[in-house]
Amino acid sequence: MQLNLRAEVKNLVFSYGDKKVLNGITLPIYENRVTALIGPSGCGKTTLLRCFNRMHDLYANAQYQGEILLYPNQSNILGKDIDPMEVRMRIGMVFQKPNPFPKSIYDNVAYGLTVRGVKKKSFIEEQVEKSLQQASLWNEVKDRLHSSATALSGGQQQRLCIARALATEPEILLLDEPTSALDPISTRHIEELIQELRKDVTIAIVTHSLHQAARVSDFTAFMYLGDLIEFGASDQIFTNPKDQRTENYITGRFG
């Protein structure tokens, strides 16, 4: 099966002031595939994920070197002439803890569209329904769209956050430990959802759960101390890693 690039990290160095966090990362992200970033706490995986949609720009001492190219036009989204807000519309993100806005379910999903200046009500309504359908939440909330989002269960709130990210039709969806605050049943729903979403959107996920990475991902990148140690097909990484450090991590010898 042919693999097409959706994004490519090239020689990415990232620092907070004088502290270097990423040491020249080069990594492909393939279209309509799930790429898992794994590694012990502090290895740089969440830092790398947040580079994709310029979240670090919110901090004054953040410094990027290198490129993140978005295909097919190979534009460098780290370029100084690129608007970070536009990047965040094209590359959505869902965080570790569900963070619905203190608004209605409808307004949460419509938020990105209204920020973008979309005014056509019928289009917004269509996108809200479509995104909630994609997030497997529509049937549970269709009769209470104008109820508060904070009244939803934790698992429903996380699916709402996924719907909110999907509403602007991002090219890539970033998931930062999306199930770590959820119960096992909600976790299973999110994992099943990831498998469905990959048909429509490219996904990169940070997870501390090696079992989850093996279950949901097509490719896995193992990071350690700011370096990318090994990248490959997930079945190869988890059954026949090439680097001893990868094997030590996935067999529980450290981390």
Curated annotation (Swiss-Prot):
Keywords of this entry? ATP-binding, Cell inner membrane, Cell membrane, Membrane, Nucleotide-binding, Phosphate transport, Translocase, Transport
Q: Report the EC number(s), separated by commas if there are several.
A: 7.3.2.1
Please give the Gene Ontology molecular function terms for this protein: ATP binding; ATP hydrolysis activity; ATPase-coupled phosphate ion transmembrane transporter activity
Q: Where is the ABC transporter domain?
A: 7-250
Chain sites annotated for binding ATP = G39, P40, S41, G42, C43, G44, K45, T46
Task: State the Pfam families in the record.
Answer: ABC_tran
The record's note on quaternary structure and interaction partners says:
The complex is composed of two ATP-binding proteins (PstB), two transmembrane proteins (PstC and PstA) and a solute-binding protein (PstS).
Q: What is this protein called?
A: Phosphate import ATP-binding protein PstB
Organism of derivation: Bdellovibrio bacteriovorus (strain ATCC 15356 / DSM 50701 / NCIMB 9529 / HD100)
Lineage here is: Bacteria, Pseudomonadati, Bdellovibrionota, Bdellovibrionia, Bdellovibrionales
